[in-house]
Amino acid sequence: MHATTIITVRKGGKVVMAGDGQVSLGQTVMKGNARKVRRLSKGDVIAGFAGATADAFTLLERLEAKLEQYPDQLMRAAVELAKDWRTNKYLRNLEAMMLVADRTVTLAITGNGDVLEPEHGTIAIGSGGNYAFAAARALMDSDKSAEEIARRALEIAGDICVYTNHNVVVETLDAE
């Protein structure tokens, strides 16, 4: 997935999701201040997406509907979305990935039907995801806060990945 980097860090009673703002079309930067991290479900869930923007918005709308159907059950809503995404002929062609988090869980949702919970308190997606993930993992044992780790990881990813910029949007929730 090109065009962005999204990371989630869970540490010190906080869950932070951060994403850059670059939108690319081929080799051209079309926009530098897109908002790819947002709140859902009355602010109780944060979500970030990488991939085709229209596809991601379709999936965010579907996730919002699943959260209304299964209130306060992010895992259940994510699994139901992943099942629909994988089995629905229309949705199957959508090209995006999502990170979602609430007070209790962080999940990556893919079009392959995967719903993955990170093992080490952090997970990242997108073209710069591997760089951000490695940077965050290296910083998890430091005295930095979850937000500081997320911002630094995106800064490093933005220095390396041509599809990631330094215009960072951050959303934070209290974690359990």
Curated annotation (Swiss-Prot):
- Listed GO biological process terms: proteolysis involved in protein catabolic process
Which InterPro entries does this one have? ATP-dep_Prtase_HsIV_su, Ntn_hydrolases_N, Proteasome_sua/b, Proteasome_suB-type
EC number(s) stated in the UniProt entry for this protein = 3.4.25.2
Q: Where in the cell is it found?
A: Cytoplasm
Q: What class of enzyme is it?
A: hydrolase
Q: Where does Na(+) bind?
A: 158, 161, 164
Mainly localized where?
cytoplasm
* One MF term in the entry's GO annotations: metal ion binding
Catalytic function, reaction form: ATP-dependent cleavage of peptide bonds with broad specificity
Query: By what means is the activity of this protein regulated?
Result: Allosterically activated by HslU binding.
> Can you tell me where the transmembrane regions are?
none
- Keyword line: Allosteric enzyme, Cytoplasm, Hydrolase, Metal-binding, Protease, Sodium, Threonine protease
Q: Which CDD domains match?
A: protease_HslV (cd01913)
The catalytic site is made up of: 4
Q: Name the job this protein performs.
A: Protease subunit of a proteasome-like degradation complex believed to be a general protein degrading machinery.
The family line of this record is: Belongs to the peptidase T1B family. HslV subfamily.
Q: Whom does it interact with, and what assembly results?
A: A double ring-shaped homohexamer of HslV is capped on each side by a ring-shaped HslU homohexamer. The assembly of the HslU/HslV complex is dependent on binding of ATP.
HAMAP family xrefs = HslV
Protein name in the entry: ATP-dependent protease subunit HslV
Which species is listed as the source? Rhizobium meliloti (strain 1021) (Ensifer meliloti)
